[in-house]
Amino acid sequence: MSAQPVDIQIFGRSLRVNCPPEQRDALNQAADDLNQRLQDLKVRTRVTNTEQLVFIAALNISYELTQEKAKTRDYAASMEQRIRMLQQTIEQALLDQGRITEKTGQNFE
């Protein structure tokens, strides 16, 4: 489906952005999150310049995204290592089973 114009409010300013209808709720949640971050920053830093607040919020969000990407990379690497270890364990068990079968002459079919 094609994007449709949506009006949102960011820190007291109206913005019209194009958004697919199925992503409208997510856009509104993102706008609410950004508004909350800007309000929190304004209180915490006592910065009143909106442009400066927006840049600080953007840096914070970018930092959080970078951290999450690193976590995802680390998790994926950990899972790959566990899968390799599991695969080696299974292969070794199959080899050992084959050796046991050869020694005893049993067949597990």
UniProtKB/Swiss-Prot annotation:
HAMAP family: ZapA_type1. One of its GO terms (biological process) is septin ring assembly. Activator of cell division through the inhibition of FtsZ GTPase activity, therefore promoting FtsZ assembly into bundles of protofilaments necessary for the formation of the division Z ring. It is recruited early at mid-cell but it is not essential for cell division. Keywords: Cell cycle, Cell division, Coiled coil, Cytoplasm, Septation. Residues 21-97 form a coiled coil. Belongs to the ZapA family. Type 1 subfamily. Homodimer. Interacts with FtsZ. One of its GO terms (cellular component) is cell septum. Its main location: cytoplasm. InterPro entries: Cell_div_ZapA-like (IPR007838), Cell_div_ZapA-like_sf (IPR036192), Cell_div_ZapA_eubact (IPR023771), Cell_div_ZapA_N (IPR042233). The keyword Coiled coil applies. SUPFAM superfamilies: Cell division protein ZapA-like. It comes from the Bacteria. Disulfide bonds: none annotated. This is Cell division protein ZapA.
